[in-house]
Amino acid sequence: MAMKRAMNLFPRYSVIAIAFVSALIFSSAPARGAAWNGIEPLKTRRDEVVKLLGAPIGESPDGVMRFKVMGGSVQVSFVNDRFVTAKKLRTELAGTVLEIVLQHEHSSDTPESLKLLNNHAFARDETKTSTIFRNMKEGLIYTFVEGMLRTTRYTFADDQLAKARRY
């Protein structure tokens, strides 16, 4: 009888143990912004971006680099000293990627094809001609113009910025 009772409790305790271990693993994962092609906000430096994407086709006076990629172009902006001061970040973050903006020339992606319409992780904003889906927890923003994907922004996650602050 005691053996039968122990065997009945085993599945219950194993489910609880698995849930506990899973929660522990997922809660200890580091905060990360949305990465693209190995480039990650607040981690990747300018020289690493050039190594990954090649020579830029242009660079603005404030340091935003433009690259031609398959399917469009990409702009990579970097953390500068003003941003570090304004957001009270650690000084070593100056020179890391702030944001990656991928401009799609002929994308056929729609909110439906990316399964964004019922995804509650994304906040939705609409204007007459555009729809924007934002997931700031992951640092990902999609902009659709007349229903077609035009830009994808990869930036830092909310809690990644909080962890980057100096205290």
Tell me what each language-model feature is:
Residues A34-I39:
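Short, recurring structural edge motifs at helix starts
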Residues V15-I25:
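Bacterial N-terminal signal peptides
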Residues A29-G33:
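Sec/Tat signal peptide C-region and signal peptidase I cleavage site
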Residues M1-P11:
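N-terminal secretory signal peptides that target proteins for export/translocation
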